[in-house]
Curated annotation (Swiss-Prot):
Signal sequence, start to end: none
PROSITE patterns noted in UniProt: DPCK
SUPFAM superfamilies from the UniProt entry: P-loop containing nucleoside triphosphate hydrolases
Annotated organism of origin: Xanthomonas campestris pv. campestris (strain ATCC 33913 / DSM 3586 / NCPPB 528 / LMG 568 / P 25)
Summary of the function given for this chain in its UniProt record: Catalyzes the phosphorylation of the 3'-hydroxyl group of dephosphocoenzyme A to form coenzyme A.
Pfam families: CoaE
DPCK domain ranges (all copies): 5-207
EC supergroup of this enzyme: transferase
Reaction catalysis annotation: 3'-dephospho-CoA + ATP = ADP + CoA + H(+)
EC number: 2.7.1.24
Family: Belongs to the CoaE family.
Descriptive protein name: Dephospho-CoA kinase
Gene: coaE
InterPro entries reported in the protein's UniProt record: Depp_CoAkinase (IPR001977), P-loop_NTPase (IPR027417)
Keyword Nucleotide-binding carried by entry: yes
Length: 207
């Protein structure tokens, strides 16, 4: 059971998944908010609530969620998007905390791409540390164009739609710079792993 939880976040194309993978190599369990978000909308109470709000048109013939149909609705209207978030986000947060605490390791990492946008510790008060993967905006832009084949304009729009680099750094307890190569990222993960294991001792004494 994990009694120490680290929230991992970063902007688009910053290398969140790469850093999470380095922690996993060290045996640290990583709970991914994107995966949990997909699990939460499986057939059940949450999907029933979504269907009641948005209608049967957001279901596929087999009764599962038609993500594309729902996406069209919520992206076209901010009010509808907020209505969806009001249904799904509390369930996602609850499951993230449950899964992290249930992990069979001294500490766990919860990967939350939009942690800054969601309110950081005001929304996730159970996070013991917040770790931000940081890259310059110009590098984010270049990676998006290379990775996804995005146009320069689209890459700029995607970056602008998220919290700013300064806003993410403002919520950080720890920062990993991902301007270098995989070896450098691995070294930073190893350093932080040692830091978190040491912090666990203090955490246990205080609690």
């Amino acid at each position: 059971m994990s009694n120490f939880i680290v929230g991992l976040t970063g902007g688009i194309a910053s290398g969140k998944s790469a850093l999470a993978a380095e922690f996993e190599k060290l045996g640290v369990p990583v709970v991914d908010a994107d995966v949990v978000a997909r699990q939460v909308v499986a057939p059940g109470l949450i999907l029933d609530a979504i269907t009641n709000r948005f209608g049967q048109g957001i279901l596929l013939p087999d009764g599962t969620l038609d993500r594309q149909a729902l996406r069209k609705i919520v992206f076209a209207d901010p009010t509808e998007r907020r209505a969806l978030e009001a249904i799904t986000h509390p369930a996602i947060r609850t499951e993230l905390q449950r899964a992290a605490k249930a992990a069979n390791h001294p500490y766990a990492i919860v990967a939350i791409p939009l942690l800054a946008e969601a309110g950081a510790r005001a929304t996730y008060p159970w996070l013991d540390r917040i770790l931000v993967v940081d890259v310059p905006v110009a590098l984010q832009h270049a990676r998006l164009m290379q990775r996804d084949g995005s146009t320069s304009a689209l890459a700029g729009q995607m970056i602008a739609a998220q919290a700013s680099r300064a806003q993410r750094l403002a919520i950080a307890d720890d920062v990993v710079s991902n301007e270098g190569n995989t070896d450098q990222l691995a070294q930073q993960a190893q350093r932080l792993d040692a830091t978190y294991r040491a912090a666990l001792q203090t955490h246990r004494i205080e609690n």
